[in-house]
């Protein structure tokens, strides 16, 4: 089997009729009969999603496989189950409420298996014994996040130098428009965190930190939709805070294992800074709305500061990736928070000074 597409499904009957057609009619199946599969992982849906998937499988038995989980594992866990049960040399992920181009599988497969590396003669010579791409990346649309036609330039193809790898990490290129070589993912044991949200963010960061060689398609192949019933819209503020904070910690723990971490540390810290800024903004809101007591607020701020002191080793002002990628409010908030006197001042105010 050449390619497996993995699609987690949870309470998605509202979206499936719009999205399934482009999946089962992928051009890949016409060009490579019996060399592709789509694994739909039903994550204990309570609506008619499971029944819809079974009907689809009865119509396309050679292209689809359905896995019904008996325990909810969240989107990350469902993707992990899909990977474990898939057989493709390469695999990719789609969310069930997003729209895939009919050529998604084929275009990504051709890109990741291309035998003509893009780059200088010196680069080609250096890779003569190993010309395999670890991943291939295409572009995507996400109108509600203002990602209109977001795609990397072809110049990013080839072996990643320090600057290219740093850009991938700091810009947080989305996981849904990529195809992954199974042997690469298994080598670094890269999996999704389970039963949490924001699981795709640290996953992508760890992939980018370990990847050596990529091929880029300057083509929009995925449309990410803002769906009213999606899982990410059902979260409360407090749980979102926990998920975003833990996402930063997982990303740090995963990327810190890389031998070349120091070469992309500033880009990695930009990713942490963005999440810490979100957490600070969330805590401020919870405190102002009297959901957090003053004591709880201060203790949580202390926890954030300890994590920041461990994970942030470069000044925000002197970090070129932070300057390029952070929103102005994120940058200003973190510069203030990381001042030496901030926690002492907060403690003084808490004591009534």
Where are the predicted features?
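Membrane-interface aromatic/basic loop that binds lipid-linked glycans or pyrophosphate carriers
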Residues: 132-133, 285-353
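Short, well-formed alpha-helical segments that are part of the catalytic scaffolds
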Residues: 12-27, 52
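Cell-envelope/extracellular polymer assembly enzymes that use nucleotide-activated donors
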Residues: 2-4, 37, 202
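Short beta-strand/loop segment that forms part of the nucleotide-sugar
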Residues: 31-44, 65-69, 96
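Glycine-rich, basic loop-to-helix element that forms the pyrophosphate-binding segment
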Residues: 69-86, 99
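Short aromatic/hydrophobic "clamp" motif used to bind/position activated sugar donors
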Residues: 91
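A conserved acidic beta->alpha catalytic loop
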Residues: 22, 42-52, 71, 101
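Donor-binding/catalytic cores of nucleotide-activated saccharide
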Residues: 76-79, 96-218, 224-240, 287-288
């Amino acid at each position: 089997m050449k390619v497996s597409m993995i699609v987690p499904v949870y309470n998605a009957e509202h979206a499936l009729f719009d999205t399934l057609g482009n999946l089962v009619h992928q051009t890949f199946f016409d060009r490579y009969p019996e060399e592709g599969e789509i694994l739909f992982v039903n994550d204990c849906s309570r609506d008619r999603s499971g029944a819809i998937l079974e009907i689809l499988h009865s119509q396309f038995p050679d292209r689809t496989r359905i896995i019904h989980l008996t325990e909810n594992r969240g989107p990350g866990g469902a993707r992990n189950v899909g990977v474990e049960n898939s057989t493709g040399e390469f695999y990719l992920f789609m969310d069930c409420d997003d729209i895939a181009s009919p050529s998604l599988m084929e275009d990504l497969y051709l890109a990741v298996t291309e035998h003509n590396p893009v780059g200088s003669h010196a680069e080609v010579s250096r890779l003569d014994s190993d010309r395999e791409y670890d991943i291939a990346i295409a572009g995507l649309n996400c109108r509600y996040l203002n990602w209109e036609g977001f795609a990397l330039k072809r110049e990013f193809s080839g072996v990643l130098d320090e600057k290219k790898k740093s850009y991938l990490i700091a810009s947080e290129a989305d996981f849904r428009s990529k195809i992954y070589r199974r042997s690469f993912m298994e080598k670094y044991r890269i999996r999704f965190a389970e039963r949490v949200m924001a699981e795709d963010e640290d996953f992508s960061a760890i992939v980018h930190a370990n990847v050596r060689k990529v091929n880029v398609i300057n083509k929009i192949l995925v449309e990410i939709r803002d769906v009213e019933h999606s899982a990410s819209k059902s979260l409360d503020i407090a749980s979102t805070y926990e998920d975003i904070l833990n996402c930063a910690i997982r990303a740090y723990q995963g990327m810190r294992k890389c031998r070349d971490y120091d070469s992309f540390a500033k880009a990695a810290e930009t990713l942490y800074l963005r999440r810490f800024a979100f957490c600070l903004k969330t805590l401020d809101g919870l405190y102002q709305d009297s959901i957090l007591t003053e004591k709880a607020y201060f203790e949580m701020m202390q926890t954030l500061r300890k994590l920041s002191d461990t994970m942030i080793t470069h000044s925000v002002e002197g970090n070129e990736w932070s300057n390029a990628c952070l929103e102005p409010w994120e940058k200003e908030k973190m510069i203030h928070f990381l001042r030496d006197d901030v926690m002492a001042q907060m403690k003084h105010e808490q004591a009534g000074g």
